Every structure is written in C-alpha cells, then in structure tokens.
Amino acid sequence: LGQIWSEINPETKVTADLEFYIKPAYLEQVQKREVKSIEEVKFFEPCTGSGHILAYAFDVFYKIYEEQGYNPTEIPELIITKNLFGVDIDQRASQLASFVLLMKGRQRNRRFLRTVETKNIQPNISFYQDFEFDNKFKNATALGSLIRVDTLELKNLVVEKNSLFAERQEEVKKLYQLLGQRYDVVVTNPPYISSSRMEGSLKQYVEATYPETKSDLYATFILRCLELCNENGLTGYMTPFNWMFLSTLEELRKIIIKKHLINNLIQLHNSGFDGATVFICTFTLRNKNINDAKGSYIRLSDFNGPQNQAPKTLEAIKNKNCGWFYTSNQGSFEKISGNPIGYWATEKIIKMFSENKSLENFASLAKGMDSGKNDLFIRLWYECESHNSNYKLDNSSSTFNNDKWIPYRKGGEFRKWFGNNDYVINWKNNGELVKSFSNSNIRNERFYFQQCLSWTLLSSSFFGVRYYEKGGVFDANGSSLFYENEEGLLQILGLLSSKISIKALQIINPTLAFQKGNLDKITINKTTNSINKGCK
C-alpha cells in the first residue's frame, strides 16, 4: 500500500514511517501512475479471517489521509467505507473483522461509534454463503474467493425487489461486487491445503479452473489475487516458500516470471515462529512484468529463531551490503532447469546451469521401492544367518535356492562417499513375500542388483552421496543413480560431492528433502574422459 501511494504521489513521506518498507531497486523503470485521490485507492483481503491485515492497512491509510490534510474526525469513516474490502468463508470471522475495523475507527475518533449509528456505517466485509438459486455461488462456502466473476456478469445482475428471494439476492450481489471489481492492492495469508486434503467440490473446482496450481490451495490463491488486482497493482502474501522450488509448482513460477514481477521477498528461517518448524516466505508481486527489473530479496536462512527474523530484516533494509540482501533479475531463473526462484545464485552458477546439460541426460536416476512394512521384511545385516545371506548378487536367480537376505539401501544418516550398508531385505524367491504384500510398491526393478550411487531422501544436515557395489535393491528413502560403467559412476560421485554441486542443489531445492527430480537438474560438463581417481 505504501509503495502504491508513493507511485501515485512521489512526494509522500509516508513510506519513511513504514519500518519494513523496501524501496524497489527498479523504481526508475516504473511507469508513472495516474494521479488520483487516496479515497480512490482500494485494498482487498480475500481471506479476511479476523481482520489482522485489514487492521494494519487501516493504520497505513490513516497516515496517508493525515499527510493529505484530511480532518481527523472524518478519516475513519472514509477508510472503512471507501478503501478497505474483505470477505471470508466464516461468518463469525468476518463479523469479528468488521468489529476490529470499527474499533480502529473508535481508537482514532472517540465519537466514531455515534457516527456509525447515525449514518448506519457498515464495513465492506462480507462472508460466503451457499446460494442454491445461483450456480456461481452454489458451493461458495467451499470455494470462497476462488470463484471467478467477470464484469459482464456483474452488469447483468438484477435484484428482483418484489421477489421472495430479494434479500438473498442482495446478499449475493455484494459478493458479485466484491469479486467483480479490481483492486490496487490485494494482500492475504491464504489457507494452506494440499490437494490430497481438499474436499470434493473444492478439489474438482481447483483442478478444472486453476490446473497450474492444483497441488496446493495457497498456490492457487497466489494466482487468484493477481486476477483480483488492477494491472500494475501489487499483491502481498505470506505462504510456504516451497512454491519457489517444488516441481509440482513449476508452472506457477513460469507464469510469475513471464507475466508478473517479484517486487520483494523475505525468506524466513524454518524456525522463524515459536513452537513450530515452518518454511515460510512473505513477498509482494507486481501485476505486470517490467523487463530487466531487479527484485529485492532478503534471505534469513542462516538466522535461527523467531527473535532474529525482524532485527535481521531491518538490518538488511538499512544495509544492503549485509550479506543476506540480494537483488536479482527474475529472467535469470529461466536459465535454471525447473525455474526455481534462486535469487542468491551467482552469475557463475547461472552460467553453469545455462551452458551445460543436466545430469538426467547422462545417467538414470530412480526412486526405490516401498516394502509396505519394514518391520516384517527388513533386518540389520548382523541379525541374519550368513549361510542364507548374499551381498554380491548379479540377479535374483540364486534367491530361488538358498539366498534369502540381500543388501537393502534405505538412506540413513549423513555420510559421504561410502557406507550405510546396515540393512538387508527378505528377497527369497525374487522378493515373493514383499511383492505379494498389499501395501508394497515395487518401483524400477530393472535397476536392482546394479552398482550405483545413492543418497538419503530426508536430511536435517547436509547432502551426502555414496557409492554401492552391485548386489542389492533400494528403498524410496534411498533413491539411486545408475551409469553404464564404474569409471563414469565414480566421476559423477566426485561431482555430486563437490561444493559447487551442493550450492547448485541448494538453489534447485533448499529444503530438507533431496528428491530424484532435484538431482536430475544438476548440470555436468561432459567434455572430458578424466576420472576422479580420488573417489576410489
């Protein structure tokens, strides 16, 4: 909101009072906005909840009105009736948000509630209801602000005043108006619900209407807020930061990179909130792309604990050379396979991605099996008798005779180069018992018994890749890489254990999960036949 107003009125001093305001690095490239009154600036919260965001927006609007010389007794009414808009699926929450705004008005003007009563002032906050007579809002309590309303539908909407449904029609008209107009600023903390947890009608609607972001509801709201925003307006969010890296949300990243502009983004430490480990970022998007513009980024990944997040953010805003403040042209993200928002990547890293082929072009990477019940089929190697254990099999033929226990790679603790050979699996008769178990999932069997590299799926420390000789099978937690010969495999082991690959992997996916799809995208310069003999 402060940014929008500073573009309308460049002489404003309001942004100087906003301690977390980040002045865009590309400000000179922004097209001058049409001059308009502060009364015309519209702010929308599509998932209002109890009104925390609207309450903060009220304070910023108040500063602007004061600076413009408005009568202090008139400002609360103007903000509530002209500037702030919100809606929620929960009636109680929307009522509480309305109450919060009225109390904000009372805080600024002790006679405000008297004005509310005499003028019948109502905040522009509504709640979703299911309206059986209107197909668009039949499942409104499930779909909420994801419902799309176009201007033609809004124009053609008629309230039949003599109808028995006149009052209900007035209520649905409010929702059409809220979702049919466009706003200068749209800000929200959207619901976080993965597709597997969405209820039927919501899941069906999201898959049909927002296919690019169907994997998580918060990602769908990122797009929806941009739709609700004026061209060149700003949207603001607090969401998980996995949209920046997950392969399932690559299409969302492509849309943002091509059509919009990441204005600024703060990536919090995963311990940034008391009592919870959450991967959160807060960011703003401009509803317009500006060629060669650089967004501003603050990376708090190295600062543990909630007590560090705000101070380190303020330090970065004041001192751009602090080491955790970055500016980046989002066009460079397109040069990295998967389009991750790798804003801290150096020019050398970007060049490495753009000039070399990814690992998937040279090697096969595969996710392993799920036994379905490890306690039933898996043992530590020393728990089994040696006479029916075999660690050097080329194939499963001998398991039809005496061999029962064979090596089983299932990740394990952080270890580089070699190791974590702790487990064996009952593979008697080519895994007959495991394969017949109802909950098992046998994947990529063609790679079983081959020499390979493997790593642990989840790690709270560092990425470590290990070499394994032929003779075993592998687990989903021990995804593996296969190559045509041992020399090439060892060369790749050296590459993946290098600092440069670790840096590349952190850009592709800086979470605790190292998935097959992440390693696929690491680039390799395959112009030499030299072997990293140190890996032996």
How would you name each of these model-derived features?
Residues 1-79, 93, 190, 245-252, 359-391, 405-408, 413-425, ...:
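Class I S-adenosyl-L-methionine
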Residues 16-37, 70-77, 157-164, 192-204, ...:
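Active-site-adjacent bridging/hinge elements
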Residues 37-40, 44, 53-185:
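Class I S-adenosyl-L-methionine-dependent methyltransferase module
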Residues 55, 62, 89, 94, ...:
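Signature of N6-adenine DNA methyltransferases within the class I
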Residues 204-208, 416-444:
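Sequence-specific dsDNA recognition surfaces
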Residues 446-464, 473-475, 492-506:
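Short Ser/Thr-interspersed hydrophobic loop/turn segments at strand-loop and sheet-helix junctions
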